[in-house]
Amino acid sequence: MGSVTSELPFRRTPLADAAETGLKIVVVGGFGVGKTTLVRSVSEIRPLNTEEVMTQAGVGVDETHGVAAKTTTTVAFDFGRISLNEHMVLYLFGAPGQERFWFLWDRLFSGTLGAVVLVDTRRMDDSWYAIDRLEHHKTPFVVAVNRFDDDPCQYSLEEIRQALALPEHVPLIDCDARVRTSGKDVLITLVNHLYELAMTRETTS
């Protein structure tokens, strides 16, 4: 799987005057899992990217096992925007994946209502830190498995849930970060999850 998106969203889409609700969503996961690609594929505006070319200085510091062909890395965050309907807008922040930039995550989580954890099953261990930090911040999240063509294992969702020790209430779905409709389905799943959590709190309070 490359990072080229197969469906291009409309660019320079104006924000609807009727938009009432803006939600900050963070996309997290390991290096090379597809965070920048996801933000790029679903954003209705030209996304802000802070990608830089990887240099020799990162050799021995950055873990590139399984993504050796990747030549750029996000050094701050990606930003995009998508309107799910006339009244709800999601502001997307893609977190940097390299371990040396993880200190930025806690700042990105400030004011976040929900998150997407992208998982690459070739590098499953890279997902642990993201899940741990979100649980620490008590930030609701969904897990999206970005399938790669060269993954020899092709684990089932149930196997992935067990490997990550995900509770049953945490949504777990497949996705293709390159495809706009697939990425949008992930975000809709997250919004529905947030709504269900809010309804549960309301009925139990």
Protein language model regions, located:
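Conserved catalytic network of the ASCE P-loop NTPase/AAA+ motor domain
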Residues: 18, 74, 83-85, 106-111, ...
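A structural signal for isolated positions on well-ordered beta-strands in alpha/beta enzyme cores
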Residues: 26, 142-143, 171
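Conserved beta-strand segments of the P-loop GTPase G domain that flank and frequently precede/overlap
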Residues: 92-95, 115-121, 143-147, 174-176
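Inter-motif core of Ras-like GTPase G domains
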Residues: 98-123, 132-137
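Active-site-adjacent beta->alpha loops and helix N-cap segments on the catalytic face
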Residues: 126-128
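Conserved G1/Walker A P-loop phosphate-binding module
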Residues: 2-67, 71, 81-91
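Canonical P-loop GTPase G-domain recognition
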Residues: 149-205
